[in-house]
Amino acid sequence: MPGSTKSVGKFIVLDSETGYGEIIFSEEFKQQYPELEHFRVFKNKKKRELEFKIIDPEENFLANASKVVRLHGGATWALNQIVGGSPLVKALREVFSDYHKDRRLLALAYYLVINGDSALANYEEFAEATFLPYIRGRSSGAISRLLRSIKKDHLSKFLNALQKETQKAYGTMLTERRYWALDSTSITSYSENISSVECGHNKDLIEAPQTNVLLVVDQTTGEPVYFRNFDGNTPDVSTVRNTLAELAIMQIDYSNVVLVTDRGYSSSQNWEDMMRNGMSFVSNARRNLNSAITELINEHYAQLLDWNNYLDFIEQSAVTVPIAWRYDEFPVEGLRRQKQTKKTLYVHLYYNHSINEEDGRRLRTALFKAIGQYKADPAKLTDAQRVLFKNYADEATDGTPTINMQKADQKLRYSGVRVLVSDVITDAQECHIAYENRVQVEHAFRTLKTRLACDRTNVHSTEAWEGKLFLQMLATSISQMVRMRIKSYNEEVQKSGRKLGYRLHYDSDRKLLAKLNNIYLLKCPSGWVFDEISGHKKDLFRIIGVPVPTVGKTMVEDKEDDQEIDISDDTSMDIALDDLENL
């Protein structure tokens, strides 16, 4: 058929100098020409002649037998069922489809999720014994090249594709109000080649060279929807503006999103930036943010103590105060602020009686011990007791120590008080629940730093760190998917009144997957079959909502090929039908 260009397989170069290599025919083409099953076909790339070698049946049998392997498969099979068809995997395929990067990244992410080990140097041994989406390119050098190939442009395209795929998957569900939790964490690094590493105080107030990671998590799914890396000496409060700018550049739709932030991001500048950019918010306002916050608490303090304002569902008293907030919608640097734009903010005041009572009990107990020690032997007072005695105790005219109740009451006045500010949430209970659910971003960070052992970068260049961070976020998303399935199962069990199925800890997904990873399968060229699965291990599959595996057929796309990320296109070229005219 002269002129035909239909692809029939791949050409694998065996000798780069002469261009001599072997043609690996596709399954579809071999179905058209079954006789090719009995031949190996070779060709000189520069010539049109084909060389056919008959396959020895005994040699072929031994070759196929050597391809039968026993692998760990339960955990990765379960992960395939969970992520398969998800917006995450579709976005991964859209952006990283070349040279099977999507499946290579997925296989590496599975390693992180199952092992909880961020040291990718151990991946090669794991890949040799585990059923994975992709099994080639597992050496340290190949992994390093893969990570360095991931640029900021890829990350932006991926996050954009993820939002689009999420929109397709959930459709009208996304028209409802969604809550995204924003927070950041510091990751230690002693590399001098990562540009974002700077000396700063981490979350434990320890000064060390570090890089910061900001994360935005969907509070419903627990999955990251946005992340970025920034300099280690940048304070939390100054990161919101850049985050909003990047979301706008990436054209991420947040019209129905409420951004939930903790006290580290509480500032009038951040509130105004979010209002200017159309990002609704719930912000935990520090009492020392400005005098107006303290004045509002004092003005409504009696209402907070009033039992009529107690909300049983959240077990706190709550009072909502609408205030008029004036700001510049289009500020001009260097010009005096006009504050001509007006918007209503809802300041929700909360009073937790239990916290106040517990703080009072601790202060009272500590003071009585300090006074007792003072009476027995003042010289033996500890430094902490001396401070307590100085701040909250007086001496009577006869030298007897007494508690100064006015000072003690002032100390406890704001104990148990929380202030949340929102531009859209008018109900105090709804606002409180939204803020409490920001625990999902804390779970994500615990997953990232503790569960996936990413408390250090473990790479030595900016290029590798960008790729490594993306891989860690991919693993965090998958881990959160598993975690949310366990959580949903437990909630259903509790509603039914049955015994709790699986205790949910921050690392519960790792423990469950570790048990599933001990389930083996036998893999051969035509497919795979699992060992018999019974009892408790069947229950584990049910907990995460996936069917118990049995047997399956190996798909064409799952088989090994010889494409590598650093191999030029002419190393693995399509063979056209017109090359076979002389057959």
Feature names for model-found ranges:
Residues 430-458:
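Short amphipathic alpha-helical "interface-anchor" segments enriched in bulky aromatics
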Residues 229, 280-434, 509-583:
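An anionic, glycine-rich sequence signature occurring as long contiguous blocks
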Residues 252, 271-280:
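Short, surface-exposed basic-aromatic patches at helix termini and helix-loop junctions that form
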Residues 235, 259-269, 287-290, 463-466:
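Acidic, metal-coordinating catalytic cores used for nucleic-acid/nucleotide bond scission
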Residues 206-249:
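Electropositive, glycine- and tryptophan-enriched low-complexity nucleic-acid-binding patches
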Residues 461-482:
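Basic, amphipathic alpha-helical segments enriched in Lys/Arg and hydrophobic/aromatic residues
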Residues 2-193, 215-233, 411, 520-583:
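Dynamic "connector" segments at or just before major functional cores
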Residues 138-140, 257, 486-500:
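Short, glycine/acidic-rich hinge or "gate" loops at secondary-structure transitions
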